[in-house]
Amino acid sequence: MGSKWQMEKHNDPYYKKAKKEDYRSRASYKLKQLDKKYKIIKEGDTVVDLGAAPGGWSQVALEKVGEEGIVVGVDLNRIKPFHEPNYYGIRGDFTKEIVQEKVMELTHGKAKVLMSDAAPSLTGVKDLDHLRSVDLVETVFKIAENILETEGNLVIKAFQHRSYTRRLP
């Protein structure tokens, strides 16, 4: 990431707002907008956040679930710890069965909300990056089949591409 990207980031109003309001990322506001409109996360819910680092979505989820809910965040990268007793961070690859088993253990096999803001490591080759993004999304759908409660909520952010209508279920 070059200095141009750094300058653009620091001039971004949501980046500035996140820093001012002590959110871990500007992505927090996208989830807040979605939740305001669709009432995705409720007090007491169990929430799984795949691709959680740096923790912006998990942070919003923790605010919404209160003390009775649980939030499990999973990412390949380190997630700076939250000092909340109902947050569990897992550093690992959610596409791997061993990590999925740990998530199932922590949630007792059920989640009311499954959300993913995961993105692949970018190569710079648009079509390849898109295919890798779709693979992650398909993995999230498979995990949802196993863990998401009936009437649960699934939120996935992914790269936009013309082939989504052909590839996704």
Annotate the PLM regions:
Residues V74-S121:
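S-adenosyl-L-methionine
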